[in-house]
Every structure is written in structure tokens, then in C-alpha cells.
């Protein structure tokens, strides 16, 4: 879990406003991504299912409570004039916070693990161990979609390393990639 400061939240008319987000980097629950139709131009159906698993709602509520405690502690407490959401946060029970998390959880837009990598005999594996697509010559994938699990941190650094590794493999073994 992490606590993120969001300086761009609520800045329509009040530049002194900021937000704090409680972030659950690893979830027990999972969503689903499905094709809406055979038409490649139709947007896929995305079902996030945030906090559907009670363990996720409980953990995110705990992080939310920690975020609130952070706001009320030390130097930051003297700078906070008002908390706009949730109203009256000190009086919310753990159950109330979990319900709040279920209703208002959203994505940080770091999807990963959507393209399976595996052995040639795995019918669900789209990519081989080099990142080459089994069904389209000349296509390699080098991003967060090939991660087998969601990392417990922001996906940026991990994605950069995947790109570096596949880029180096391309340089050293170009024939493997059809070059």
C-alpha cells in the first residue's frame, strides 16, 4: 500500500486544495477484460471489480484510515483547514470506510498482465519467452501487458526494465525477432 499526494485534485477554483489517495498496489480480487464482439474497432468490455474481495476493501480501508491519521499528525495537521471528503472522517467506522472504498475505488490506469507469455504447447500463451507474438510475424511486445502478475509497486520502472531486456535481446539476437 502507498499514500499518494495529488496536487491536481479539485483545483477548479481553489489552488490551495490537494488530495491524498490511498493506493492498494496488490489486490486479491481480479477484474475481467472481454471482447465486445469480433469487430476489432469495438471497445472491449472492462469489469474492474474494485474491492469486490472483502480482503481488498478491508486493506484499502486500513490504508485510508492511515491516510487520515497522516493528515491529522505533525506538521501537516497545522496546514489542514478542512477535509472535504469524506465528511466527518474521524467518526467513520472501519465498516463505513470499507463501504466507502467499495463505492469510490478507481483505477490508477496501470493495467498489466493482459498478454500471456508461455511455452509453445500452452494454448493460452500469445507470446513466447522472447516476447515474440506467436500469431503475427515481426511483432514483439515489451510492456506491462506481459507481466505475469501485477507488481506491488508502480508499473513504470518494471515496464522500463522489460523494454530494456527485450531491446537488448533484439540487439543481440535479431534473427529471433525476424530481423
Each model region followed by its residue ranges:
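FAD-dependent oxidoreductase catalytic-site/capping-region signature
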Residues: 1-158, 166-179
